Amino acid sequence: MKKGLGKIRKIKKKHIFLALLAVIVLGGLAKAYSAWVGTTRIAFLNYQAIALGQISHANDNAMIKLSEITTDDFDHLDDYDMIIVNGMGLRIDENQRKQLEEASYKVPTLTHAATNPANNIVSVDNFDADYLMQYIENGGKKNYHSMLAYIRKFIDGKKFMAPEPERVNERPDYLLTHFDPKDEKGDELGFNSIREYNAFLAKNGLYKDGAPTILLTGFMGAAPDMEKAFEKKGFMVYRINQLQGFIAGHHADSIQANAVVNMAHGRLGDYFVEFLKQKNIPLFSPLNINRLTTDWENDKQGMNGGFMSQSIVTPEIDGAIRPYVVFGQRINKEGLQEVYGIPDRMESFVESVQGYV
């Protein structure tokens, strides 16, 4: 009987040992998975939907998860593997700043373009900060794609699905740009002369002798959506990236423009008013509601405050007409807000411009 009980005890001890060993092994595997394989979670604070949408479009790695956060999420900052802050115009109080600083001790944090020195919270080392800043400042799909890869591989330390990031693609500040017809989700193509741009249009079947011509400028919208809408209606579109240089350098004099479309936020300035007078052409001002389209549609007031002033009132000083809503925001597949041209309103706007020219 005693021998039987002893045998049972040995078996129980063996089972307990094996169970403990399994727990240790599983725990080790879980830690290894989290350290080398798991998802890299990157939080973006105070980012405009236009910029965040571009970063989202550059992300093709299923193991990288992007999230837009606000001050309401500050109690959960430890949930992320990296925090990137747009410091321009960031409004946080002392308590919120303290929360962000404390989180930065545990979570690698990078703030760029801080207008308030107190908000310049950075906890990555100088080398990483400088490299990430270069990706951000140069922008574009390639740079954003490499930035995300850099964060996963070198900041988060993951081994699985962690490709080597490419070097920073230093993008010149082109005079004109256009989306790539062969890769609409890729980086915009850049041009520094009308001759280059016209050759590109001709090569892609977009150059049309005698067609009405639009100068498209500004950054408060999805420019490719508007380019495509006008080109579909038979317009020639010159997407101006450096408007002042374009006019001062007399590049505009070689184009028989019929109208200017400015995706405005604020004034262009007196030099541009003189340009409109000389050319005797109209200036149109499509609006970006800067919020979810569904929220805007359900709001009887629609637009108010300083954003309305910068979008409607100050552009009218330049002579802008037809302040018509064309751009809104929607939720993309990553759960982030992105700017897009609202199809029916875009079509109505283009037809309205067509009626003037």
Whereabouts are the PLM-identified features?
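An N-terminal assembly and electron-transfer interface module characteristic of large anaerobic redox
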Residues: 2-357
